[in-house]
Amino acid sequence: MDHLPIFCQLRDRDCLIVGGGDVAERKARLLLEAGARLTVNALTFIPQFTVWANEGMLTLVEGPFDETLLDSCWLAIAATDDDTVNQRVSDAAESRRIFCNVVDAPKAASFIMPSIIDRSPLMVAVSSGGTSPVLARLLREKLESLLPQHLGQVARYAGQLRARVKKQFATMGERRRFWEKFFVNDRLAQSLANADEKAVNATTERLFSEPLDHRGEVVLVGAGPGDAGLLTLKGLQQIQQADIVVYDRLVSDDIMNLVRRDADRVFVGKRAGYHCVPQEEINQILLREAQKGKRVVRLKGGDPFIFGRGGEELETLCHAGIPFSVVPGITAASGCSAYSGIPLTHRDYAQSVRLVTGHLKTGGELDWENLAAEKQTLVFYMGLNQAATIQEKLIAFGMQADMPVALVENGTSVKQRVVHGVLTQLGELAQQVESPALIIVGRVVGLRDKLNWFSNY
């Protein structure tokens, strides 16, 4: 270990920055946020320093580096564009045993500045020891996506409850189980973020009053249309907190690779060599695992409330009194159309969009007359086996035979394939495509030749 990571208490302590440019301004902002009593020494200053000085936030000393400014300092930063000056600052600080950071010169510095994720009072610092700042920044960005913005509020509130928790729960094990429940409670986190004091108090009292081995909960998460980059941040957070993930065939392997490693996984979809698990059995799996006290994530392709039968699954949980929440996902219609260069609406061609299931309950029938109307886009989910019928019905109810159509197979993934033609070819085109696939019908499909961007990657 080349550097010891420490967190410095600088509030109301003297610190010095030498330099008055953009880099110095970024360092000054950090020290001011930490509450330092800051002096900045430079030949010239960018305007932001004057603003801060006029507001009484720092002291400016205009002129060459004056090493006597270090005499009362706890910490210094050399941030000029002159290597000689920076080295003088470093040497002067070293002789006084003052920690000094030298921007872009880690070997000349006695401490380095990490990339910071600020969820005060929770702080995360990432450093490559000065060898690869870009790598540290990229890692910080990944960690940023995993840590909700309101996490600091949750941590601060936890501090207020520590004495009560210690008083109510006698053993370390009981306290640990309480805090585990506390920190994964989405209702509490959202209430804190919304400054809803009534909801915060109600949720807190519920956490304290319920048994530590109480029933678990189910989170219905939309995984998006395929590309793992389209999974929402909240969806990612949920699958990394899950005890068990119940998933279907439309969830890509890339997304499943993001699931917490020690979480149990239950596959309930149809693939080669597997039989589709009946919906009622899926409902019972969710119910059974939640009743064991587990945090269950039901992971579905697309959005769980758009032809995902999410409502049916939640009704079962509701009847049993199991807590649940929903994380929306990007639905296939939106993702597949965007990755195919097909805008679902356009002022010249489509003023509305209809999302239609091609898989009806026995005896069901679609409203073909309205579906055949002009100036709209139709998106059929699960319609591949009914493509010939869709073609026949739309033409019979008045849709023009030359209406453009597209079928998107494995949309948004590296395996995406798009075939397109006109309505009279729909049944034939469907024979060239394998599930999962989406059918798009409308004049907007004609824009694909100009707007298709994904195939160029």
Curated annotation (Swiss-Prot):
Uroporphyrinogen-III C-methyltransferase: annotated segments: 216-457
Region span, Precorrin-2 dehydrogenase /sirohydrochlorin ferrochelatase: 1-204
Active site: 248 (proton acceptor), 270 (proton donor)
Positions bearing Phosphoserine: 128
Residue sites binding S-adenosyl-L-methionine per the record: 225, 301-303, 306, 331-332, 382, 411
GO terms for biological process, alphabetical: cobalamin biosynthetic process; methylation; siroheme biosynthetic process
Record-linked SUPFAM superfamilies: NAD(P)-binding Rossmann-fold domains, Siroheme synthase middle domains-like, Tetrapyrrole methylase
InterPro entries in alphabetical order: 4pyrrol_Mease (IPR000878), 4pyrrol_Methylase_sf (IPR035996), 4pyrrole_Mease_sub1 (IPR014777), 4pyrrole_Mease_sub2 (IPR014776), CobA/CysG_C (IPR006366), NAD(P)-bd_dom_sf (IPR036291), Siro_Cobalamin_biosynth (IPR050161), Sirohaem_synt_dimer_dom_sf (IPR037115)
Known EC number: 2.1.1.107, 1.3.1.76, 4.99.1.4
Alphabetical keyword list: Cobalamin biosynthesis, Lyase, Methyltransferase, Multifunctional enzyme, NAD, Oxidoreductase, Phosphoprotein, Porphyrin biosynthesis, S-adenosyl-L-methionine, Transferase
Binding locations of NAD(+): 22-23, 43-44
Pathway(s) per entry: Cofactor biosynthesis; adenosylcobalamin biosynthesis; precorrin-2 from uroporphyrinogen III: step 1/1; Cofactor biosynthesis; adenosylcobalamin biosynthesis; sirohydrochlorin from precorrin-2: step 1/1; Porphyrin-containing compound metabolism; siroheme biosynthesis; precorrin-2 from uroporphyrinogen III: step 1/1; Porphyrin-containing compound metabolism; siroheme biosynthesis; siroheme from sirohydrochlorin: step 1/1
Catalysed reactions, as listed in the record: uroporphyrinogen III + 2 S-adenosyl-L-methionine = precorrin-2 + 2 S-adenosyl-L-homocysteine + H(+); precorrin-2 + NAD(+) = sirohydrochlorin + NADH + 2 H(+); siroheme + 2 H(+) = sirohydrochlorin + Fe(2+)
Pfam families: CysG_dimeriser, NAD_binding_7, Sirohm_synth_M, TP_methylase
Highest taxon above the source species: Bacteria
Annotated transmembrane regions: none
Any one Gene Ontology molecular-function term assigned to this protein's record: sirohydrochlorin ferrochelatase activity
NCBIfam families in the cross-refs: cobA_cysG_Cterm, cysG_Nterm, PRK06136.1, PRK10637.1
Entry similarity comment: In the N-terminal section; belongs to the precorrin-2 dehydrogenase / sirohydrochlorin ferrochelatase family.
The protein's role, per its UniProt record: Then it catalyzes the NAD-dependent ring dehydrogenation of precorrin-2 to yield sirohydrochlorin. Finally, it catalyzes the ferrochelation of sirohydrochlorin to yield siroheme.
Protein name: Siroheme synthase
Source organism per UniProt: Salmonella paratyphi B (strain ATCC BAA-1250 / SPB7)
Upper taxonomic lineage: Bacteria, Pseudomonadati, Pseudomonadota, Gammaproteobacteria, Enterobacterales
